[in-house]
Regions:
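Positively charged n-region of N-terminal signal peptides that target proteins for export
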Residues: 1-4
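Detector for outer-membrane/organellar transmembrane beta-barrel domains
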Residues: 290, 294-320, 336-370
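Acidic, glycine-rich low-complexity/disordered segments
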Residues: 19-83, 87-91
């Protein structure tokens, strides 16, 4: 009987010790500590003994997609961090600034030389290089069909440098042509920031032409990717044969926390750009201010998802009325569906979009939408309708049919892209 009682007490003590050990381990795990520990004091209480141990090196797995020097700059912000929670927070910021570092990439940790900590980075990027286009068709008042088009080339990681190139050509109608080119490099030589160059041209026959060039520095912050630089713009109002130009300072922020690069259905996206400078025309110089923003957020509702998408843009010239060249253009698949591409122009615009997504959301999405615009000069009725998106392998397709109170008959918007 005494042996039985002794065995019971020993078993109870072992179980209690295991529970305490598990509790203390979970506390260390919550703190993200690598080398700290709990120590029993003379009062039979556990004291937390913190030992600072910072990450001093990185080791990459699956690094063949990007040059190692680029990877070291991408993940350099985690060096010197002292616990796992700090690293995970920094990794979220890195992913939001460079979305090709998706959830398939993760970090583990290794101890070596007794007191040193290395970050082991399993790098599995998803680069989204593609060529795409846009096709729109609608029936005009004279009964003839009007066709519009766009070509979009997007390249990521050429030459394994982690850079991004965009080339867009657009013809909203028979008289209008647009060209946009940008090149972004994540890091300039060995500096902790990169560069972004943008060229934008816009021409409407017998009306105006306008061209702008931007040069920016880009870098990483806790909120995403920051941007800072300058912009030069020049143009001519062909209707009155008057030239204009401007020089300005530009700042911006971009963060992308969406879950899927082709068909996102969770997370959020935010981008904003502010421009302040001097505008010069035949009346003289004046102050210019421009602002743009985009915000997307996905919310689960049962087996479906609601996309909330807000978009706004404003251009302000002190003591000036905006000519057509400077006004914000909108209408069509990228702004207000149910209308022709760039059918309208205004000094400022705010568009609130709601989409109800359902289906196998990673591969195909059926949706019902409404685009609600608010503009400075007049009233634009909302566009509404339904559509379908699909991604298979390397082919992505976006089709929507939009309606509006203003125009009789619907507008068909088709957008496609193919991976490269």
């Amino acid at each position: 009987m005494r042996i039985f009682k002794l065995m019971t007490l020993i078993s109870f003590g072992i179980i209690q010790a295991q529970e305490i050990d598990s509790l203390l381990y979970s506390k260390l795990y919550e703190k993200g500590e690598w080398k700290s520990f709990y120590q029993l004091n003379k009062n039979n209480e556990f004291d937390f003994v913190q030992i600072n141990s910072r990450i001093d090196s990185m080791y990459f797995i699956h690094q063949h997609n990007v040059e190692k020097s680029v990877l070291k700059h991408l993940f350099k912000p985690i060096l010197g961090l002292s616990n796992q929670n700090q690293v995970e927070g920094q990794l979220i910021a890195i992913k939001s600034a460079y979305p090709f570092i998706n959830d398939g990439s993760f970090i583990s940790f290794a101890k070596y030389d007794k007191n040193r900590i290395a970050a082991v980075i399993d790098f599995n990027p998803v680069f989204k290089s593609q060529i795409g286009g846009l096709l729109g068709a609608s029936k005009g008042k004279d009964g003839d069909w009007i066709t519009t088009g766009e070509i979009d080339v997007h390249l990521e990681n050429p030459r394994k440098k982690g850079s991004v190139m965009d080339l867009k050509w657009k013809q909203p109608d028979a008289f209008t042509r647009k060209l946009y080119f940008s090149l972004e490099t994540p890091f300039l030589f060995s500096l902790p920031f990169g560069t972004l160059f943008q060229l934008d041209q816009n021409f409407i026959e017998k009306n105006y032409h306008i061209e702008s060039f931007s040069g920016l520095l880009v870098g990483l912050s806790h909120f995403g990717q920051w941007r800072f630089g300058g912009k030069k713009e020049s143009g001519k109002d062909l209707s009155i044969n008057e030239r204009f130009n401007s020089e300005s300072v530009l700042i911006g922020l971009k963060t992308d926390k969406r879950n899927n690069r082709w068909l996102p259905h969770s997370g959020q996206f935010f981008e904003t750009v502010l421009t302040l400078g001097k505008f010069n025309d035949y009346l003289g110089k004046t102050t210019m201010f421009e602002s743009k923003f985009k915000f997307q957020k996905y919310k689960d509702i049962g087996n479906s998802v609601i996309l909330i998408y807000s978009k706004g843009e404003r251009i302000f010239l002190n003591s000036r009325k905006l000519n057509l060249a400077k006004k914000v253009k909108f209408g069509g698949i990228n702004t207000v569906r149910g209308y022709n591409e760039d059918q309208f122009a205004s000094e400022w615009i705010f568009i609130q979009t709601f989409e109800w997504l359902f289906g196998d959301l990673d591969q195909s999405q059926s949706f019902i939408f409404i685009d609600i615009p608010a503009v400075s000069d007049y009233t634009i009725h909302p566009g509404y309708g339904l559509g379908f998106r699909q991604y298979k392998g390397t082919i992505a397709l976006d089709i929507s049919i939009g309606f509006s109170k203003r125009d009789a008959g619907g507008k068909i918007h088709i957008k496609f892209s193919s991976g490269l």
